[in-house]
Each structure stands twice: as C-alpha cells, then as structure tokens.
Design a protein with these regions (language model features):
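Conserved polar/disulfide-associated segments of primarily extracytoplasmic proteins
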Residues: 46-153, 157
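Sec-dependent signal peptide cleavage junction
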Residues: 22-31
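N-terminal Sec-pathway targeting helices
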Residues: 1-13
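Intrinsically disordered, low-complexity segments enriched in Ser/Pro/Gly/Ala and basic residues
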Residues: 19, 23, 56-59
Length: 186
C-alpha cells in the first residue's frame, strides 16, 4: 500500500514535467538552427530557442521549441509519458520513433484534432500551447491533423510541432520536409 501511494505522486510529477516540456516557455542558452519553409511567415517573437512559422494559404503552423532547463528528463522517460498523455486526451492517432535531419532522432506522434479551439480548451491549464495555436486565425476552426516530435540533443529536450487542416496535411508535410531535415540543435 505504501509503495502504491509513493508511485502516484511520482507518476503525476513525471507526467506534468513531460507535458510542460512541450508547452513551457524557455530561457535556455541552447540554439536551434533551421532553414525556414519558403513562403511561410515567421512569428515576430522567434528567437534562438523558439521558432514558429505560419502559412496563410493553408492555415498551417510549424514550430521548434527548446524545453526549459528545469525539464532535463531523459527522452526515454519523457517519450512514453507523452504518448500516454496524448492517448488519454483522445488525440493520439499513432506514435513511433523517427530519425531525421542532421543525426536527429526522437518520438513522433500523429494527432487528430477536432479543432484548434477545442484543443486550446482541453489544454487550457498548460502555458505556451497558444504559441502554436493562436497563430491560426479565428473563424478557421476546422479539423486539424498534427505531428509532434520530441527529441534530445546534448541533454536538452526539444519539441517540433506541425499542424495543418486535415485536407492539406499530407501535401504540406511534403513541403516542409526540407525544413525538418535542416534542423540542427547546438
């Protein structure tokens, strides 16, 4: 009984930390280098540890973000917990491991999102989800598909997220592949 009581708080702490990885602001010294997708608009708040672009014609968003330094969990712990969290939220389509770009690897999640506003509502207690979703114009609340990649370099965790309306997802995904392949974490 005592061990079960200890495991519950530990599990909650690890889950909160893993989810915070994706949605927290960062104040780190690490740097992300990437070739931005052509014909996409950069977020004016982009910096060396948080980069977001938006494409008006397809209402798509891609972002690369470094986790805060206090979230130094190994990827092999964070990945499965994020998988379970997304499954519990009912948005996980599939999960696998991926190798991409400049010797990068990580966990990849494909997500089915009924609409950006419902996603915002379901993650309302988590900071920084808006940095990706609020760039989608109001009134464009259609079903979206998403891809989330968690990766780790030199002990730092990073999240890469791509969101696009379902009808455009595959074609826009092909368009941004060179951007994914150009990502370097220093």
């Amino acid at each position: 009984m005592k061990n079960r009581l200890l495991n519950i708080p530990l599990g909650v702490v690890i889950l909160v930390a893993a989810v915070s990885l994706v949605f927290s602001p960062t104040f780190a010294n690490a740097e992300i280098k990437v070739t931005p997708p052509s014909n996409w608009h950069a977020n004016p708040d982009n910096n060396s540890t948080s980069l977001i672009w938006f494409q008006n014609s397809t209402k798509s968003v891609i972002g690369v973000k470094k986790a805060p330094d206090f979230l130094s969990f190994p990827l092999f712990l964070a990945g499965p917990f994020v998988t379970q969290f997304l499954a519990d939220k009912g948005v996980l389509e599939s999960a696998d491991q991926i190798y991409f770009g400049n010797s990068n690897s990580g966990y990849r999640y494909f997500l089915n999102l009924s609409s950006p506003s419902k996603l915002l509502d379901s993650f309302s207690g988590l900071p920084q989800i808006g940095s990706f979703l609020t760039t989608i114009p109001e009134g464009y609340d259609v079903p979206y598909k998403g891809m989330l990649i968690l990766t780790q370099k030199q002990g730092d965790l990073y999240a890469i997220i791509f969101l696009s309306p379902k009808e455009n997802f595959d074609s826009v995904m092909k368009e941004i592949q060179p951007t994914l392949d150009s990502i370097q974490f220093n």
